[in-house]
Amino acid sequence: MKRVRAHLRIYGRVQGVGFRWSMSREARKLGVHGWVRNLPDGTVEAVIEGDPERVEALIGWAHQGPPLARVTRVEVKWEEPEGLEGFKVVG
């Protein structure tokens, strides 16, 4: 099975709105692996790996986020997969 890795930076009102926990739940539903964390500048960073279609689906979800979020921009950098397993909320 082909596996891809995306490094995301999510901008807007994305902290204090349940973004990380909602993304973790969505990732688990999709079978996507990786992690998500808040950064001091108010953005959210995530690294996600898995089947290309499932990773794209989670990127699509990140453009909306949970109901209280107001996402203004999502930056995506494609990287080489490293074999992450599970999905964690860190930081």
Swiss-Prot record:
Record: active site: R20, N38
Family, similarity comment: Belongs to the acylphosphatase family.
Reaction equation(s) it catalyzes: an acyl phosphate + H2O = a carboxylate + phosphate + H(+)
Residue span(s) of domain Acylphosphatase-like: 5-91
EC number: 3.6.1.7
TM region positions: none
Signal sequence bounds: none
Name of this protein: Acylphosphatase
Gene Ontology MF: a single term: acylphosphatase activity
Pfam families reported in the protein's UniProt record: Acylphosphatase
UniProt keyword annotations, A-Z: Hydrolase
Lineage top rank: taxon: Archaea
Gene3D superfamilies: 3.30.70.100
Keyword ATP-binding: no
